[in-house]
C-alpha cells in the first residue's frame, strides 16, 4: 500500500486497514505536538489517527493542556491524558527508536534549531 492510498483509506473508517504501521515523531518538544494529532477526535481519519480514535474525556484533557500555560499543571494534564490513552489500548506501540547524536564544535555553533530532529538540522560554519 503506497502512502497516498493509505492516507485516503484511513479517512474512511469502513475502508481503513485493520492495522497500519506508522512512524511518528514530533516537530517540536511539546506533548501537544504529538498527542493532539494522534488522539484528539478532530484528527480521526488522518494518517496520524488512523485508528479513528475518538474519546471525549481525552479530548477535554488535550484541550485543557493546550490552553494551560503553567508547566506543572500541563505536565499533570498530559500525564493523565497519556495514562488514559494507554488504558484505552488505542494502539500497539512496538518500539521507540533510541538515537545518540553528536556534533563537533568545529562544524560551527550548536544546531540552528535545538528543538528539532538533529538529523534534519543545518549547521553554520561561520
Segments (PLM) and residue ranges:
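Detector for C-terminal structural segments
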Residues: 9-126
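Short helix-initiation/N-cap motifs at beta->coil->alpha
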Residues: 1-8
Amino acid at each position: 500500500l503506497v502512502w497516498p492510498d493509505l492516507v485516503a483509506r484511513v479517512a474512511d473508517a469502513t475502508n481503513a486497514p485493520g492495522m497500519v504501521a506508522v512512524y511518528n515523531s514530533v516537530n517540536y518538544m511539546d506533548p501537544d505536538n504529538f498527542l493532539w494529532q494522534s488522539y484528539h477526535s478532530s484528527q480521526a481519519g488522518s494518517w496520524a489517527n488512523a485508528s479513528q480514535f475518538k474519546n471525549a474525556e481525552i479530548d477535554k484533557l488535550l484541550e485543557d493542556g493546550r490552553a494551560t500555560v503553567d508547566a506543572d499543571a500541563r505536565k499533570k494534564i498530559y500525564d493523565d491524558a497519556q495514562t488514559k490513552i494507554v488504558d484505552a489500548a488505542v494502539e500497539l506501540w512496538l518500539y521507540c527508536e533510541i538515537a545518540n547524536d553528536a556534533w563537533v564544535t568545529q562544524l560551527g555553533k550548536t544546531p540552528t534549531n535545538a528543538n528539532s530532529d538533529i538529523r534534519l538540522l543545518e549547521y553554520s560554519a561561520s
